[in-house]
Amino acid sequence: MTGRFVRDQSAMTKAIASSGKAGQETTKQTTSAEKLESENALLSTVKEMNQGWMSRLGAGNDYDETEADPADTYGDTEADLPPTIKPEHIKKETRKQDKALGIKNVAGTSESERKALKQWDEDENKSDTEKLAFLAGFRYRQDHNSVVLRAQTEQLKSLVDILTSSATSVSRAASDIVNATTMSTSKLAAAITKHIEVPPHETLTKIEMPKLPLISSEAGSISGVKSVDGKSVDEEIIDSNKKESTRIKEEAKTPKPQIVTPPVIDSGPIITVGQMASVLGGEVKDILEFYEIGMEKFESVAKDLGLSYEGLLRKYGGLSGLKGTLKKKINLL
């Protein structure tokens, strides 16, 4: 089962390789709008790719054993293979697939994943549907998440990081597989937590994950998972990116008003109304009445005369004398 699924990926490998190049070019772009448009191109590629191989899963149906696949008949050992197929051919093709995906190990990203696949493949109590679903979980993360996220960060080198660094990624992979097969959520979760190593927390904090929409329980296949409003996840992300890209471009066309900060003027020590009244020999109510005329006018007169406001008050005999004089000067200021 493992060999069958791994080898049946030649068309997918080419799509992933071309998508990887698109992702590398995307990292050179500078504006948010361009990044969103590039992500849409990647999503479209992945969507078409997933529709091909996930359609073979069906909705809870077993693998179509009627398709012509030498591995179904002959198995994976050299003795079982027909003369035209050699083990080195399988290994070579697998290495090409893994290289295109940026994966170091065969059929997965870590030793624990390969052990998990082998254990599931040899378990006689597991049905073909369950085995295929478990394997599809790893392949889904290779084909979908690694391609989409490659454009945003080069830190996502392994599928283990992608799966465990985001609850959303786990939710998407689990929902897709559960709804495409008869496998239960609890069984899939138990398998994942048992066999996959979780990277350190420090690694997760450095990874910038994309914003992904929530997924409802109703789903068909990986490329056709329905969200709450009835759209597929891929379509919803693409629509959202288009709107955000348009908004960013429109904002760029409209110049933003420049906010000019007025210079800070040092007006000297702060004097309370009571202190001013005490120094000038007036009353608090006179100070308050004076401020109704306007402190700005008062300071302008003092500046014109080359005096401080205390000196101005003394010059005109306190508040009472200044009020009349200042009122006459208001129209001249």
Swiss-Prot record:
Region described as Disordered: spans on this chain: 1-41, 57-84
Composition skew (Polar residues), residue ranges: 24-33
Highest taxon of source: Viruses
Bias-annotated ranges (Acidic residues): 62-79
UniProt protein name: Protein 2
Origin species: Lettuce big-vein associated virus (isolate Japan/Kagawa)
Lineage: Viruses, Riboviria, Orthornavirae, Negarnaviricota, Haploviricotina
